[in-house]
């Protein structure tokens, strides 16, 4: 995290992250950048680009990317896959615009899935995405 956040986290250090990866550890980035005006999506995109990540796993309050807000439109269609450019062009706001552009320009795909799904994070880490894969 970019700030002190209790016993379960450490302050972000690129060197410490690289050391953790070298030791085969699974690391989570939390807390965004620690600066106002930047979302947690942008923070994770920044860290993923810095660390040359293969992809970003985004656990959200929604279970994927939809063509419209499923809370408003009961007929909203969930995408299994979509490109970042399509997300931007269609103004699908599940991932913020800055993070989307950063990921597109740096060829970092994303997987969007529900934070509330049982074993959702573990499944996503195993490549079993029950959500939307957003390709760069």
Located regions from the model:
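C-terminal catalytic "cap/lid" subdomain
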Residues: 1-136
